[in-house]
Amino acid sequence: MKSRQNSRTFTIIFLGMLSAFGPFVMDMYLPTLPTMTGYFNTSSSMVQLGLTASMIGLAAGQLVFGPVSDKFGRRSSLLAAMILFLLSTAGCILSETILQFVALRLVQGIAGAGGVVISRSIAADKYAGHELAAMLAIIGAINGIATVAAPIAGGTLSEIGGWHGIFCFLLFLGVILLAGSFHFNESLSSEQRASMRWSNVFRRFRTVTRNRQYLCYILQYGLTMGVLFANIASAPFIMQQHYGLSPMEFSLCFGANAIAMVISSTVAVRFRNMKDALGFGSSAMLLLSTVLFVALYLGCNFWIYETLAFCLLAMVGMTFTASSALAMDCERTNAGIASALLGAIGFAFGGIVSPLAGLGNILHTAGLLFLAGSLLSHLCANYALARHNSTRRITDEIFYMLRRASASTRILRK
């Protein structure tokens, strides 16, 4: 008997909240880092280890929950992830030492990764082609809003209840998503589920990683994520220290740039297909990053920098939507693993690029990271699109020949 399907509205809200785990788990407690050093009587570097641990957990956890959800289904895997998230968050609140807190942040990141990776897998289960791209664009827009809202909400909650108040809110969010997971109807039928033997898991990973087109799409996604994290890591110093903006002015500009990503991710689905959106977005990224690189080296004024950064991040949002949709469409039969690798490589590139942004002259370093990331992502996009276009040309030629043969047959019959 076919199970009852969730409404589209519920699916959008639920998947959007799951995908927002990344920014909420990572960014929400940033305003309280200085006060936590006093609470745990430790150094700032030890407190920042909690942020590093959560990022590692968010990357590694996707490689765990992706294959697990392919075997046991999305709903049961979500329930396990949400329960683990609640337990680890409660543990963070009750932590007495910084080492306990860091260890539990790692577990919290792994659990949060379950929500992120399974949300994309559910979208791939339920939608395909342009509909999948539209759903991922909506999820990306919600994720972009969460990126803006997380530090602002964290600052507000820290005024009320300190860092404990922030983690109490995360606990409340986990309860809501656990309830949503109970209400969610399984999207992966038992016939579609994969064997969980280690040999089969490794075989499926090998199958996915041998798909060159998929690899190009996720590499393009990861390199674009590197451009985004280069901006996140450098923008506070460029805007506040170099251009002299106040924290409030910086927050407004940071929020405006995030909104640019939200808008462009929805614009991407207006293209005829996602390949056109990826081609346009990656080309525009390369052009804008080249101009921004030159502007930062020459010492431009603030409004030139902000205008170029705004436009660059808009193209980042567009390529995120296109490359993630194309990657997931390439490996529909291994959606969990495909989603896991996509998310893991994104956080991996983000983790590599973030510390590099602080080396040397930050204006020059940031400009170089923007240019290098955009150039490499453009090359990956071009390679993937060229493979598709060559296949399409061959297919078109075959259909053309068949049509000519059919027409010749009709003429002979007459």
Predicted regions and their residues:
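A late C-terminal transmembrane helix in Major Facilitator Superfamily
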Residues: 326-362, 369-370
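Juxtamembrane intracellular "pre-TM" segments in multi-pass secondary transporters
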Residues: 2-4, 186-217
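Helix-loop-helix hairpin linking two adjacent transmembrane segments in secondary transporters
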Residues: 100, 129, 137-182
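Helix-breaking motifs and short loop linkers at transmembrane-helix boundaries and internal kinks
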Residues: 41, 73, 94-100, 111, ...
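Paired small-residue
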Residues: 84, 88-91, 99-107, 303-311
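Cytoplasmic helix-loop-helix junction between adjacent transmembrane helices
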Residues: 104-145
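C-terminal transmembrane helical hairpin of 12-TM major facilitator-type secondary transporters
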Residues: 278-322
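Conserved MFS/SLC helix-loop-helix module at the cytosolic interface between two early adjacent transmembrane helices
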Residues: 60-99
